[in-house]
């Protein structure tokens, strides 16, 4: 790799970003590229999964953490409080009456803005190369897998009412500082 080269790496998905931050980006940076581009074949994972994959703690997701950071940077933390209050108001409703209140926190920002913040958060201090993380879009995911619409951890559109209950509980746990599963 020459110092004028861009280095592209493909990842199947980026959930927490820990491995990227703690090792992969550092290893790639030692090759001295001008830029490191990490392409995720999955969209940003924003919501917990409650149908088989153990991704129940929303505070572990880098897309969520990037969005929280953007809300703080733009002095819009009130959106977190409003979403929390909506979740709490629905907490004892039958799950069929619940809605995904966590979607509200993502509304102020574009996918590109969140991706840029993820890149910033996952770039280790002392990295020489520019780091850019690019995610698959939801529309392109649907085009590539037209017969499989299992996209709830990207969109928050759960296929059952229990999904809304889980996402709201995961957010309540996050705001209340409870490091426990939402189900």
Where are these regions (language model features)?
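PRPP-associated nucleotide enzymes
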Residues: 1-183
């Amino acid at each position: 790799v020459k110092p004028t080269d861009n280095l592209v790496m493909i990842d199947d998905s980026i959930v927490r970003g820990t491995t990227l931050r703690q090792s992969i980006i550092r290893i790639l940076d030692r090759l001295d590229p001008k830029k490191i581009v990490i392409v995720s074949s999955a969209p940003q994972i924003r919501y917990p999964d409650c149908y088989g994959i153990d991704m129940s703690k929303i505070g572990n997701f880098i897309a969520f953490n990037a969005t929280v950071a953007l809300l703080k940077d733009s002095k819009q933390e009130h959106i977190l409080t409003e979403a929390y209050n909506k979740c709490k108001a629905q907490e004892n409703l039958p799950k069929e009456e619940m809605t995904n209140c966590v979607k509200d926190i993502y509304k102020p920002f574009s996918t590109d803005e969140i991706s840029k913040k993820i890149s910033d958060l996952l770039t280790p201090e002392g990295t020489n190369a520019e780091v850019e993380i690019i995610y698959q879009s939801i529309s392109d995911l649907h085009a590539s897998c037209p017969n499989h619409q299992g996209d709830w951890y990207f969109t928050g559109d759960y296929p059952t009412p229990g999904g809304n209950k889980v996402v709201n509980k995961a957010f309540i746990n996050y705001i209340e500082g409870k490091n426990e599963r939402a189900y």
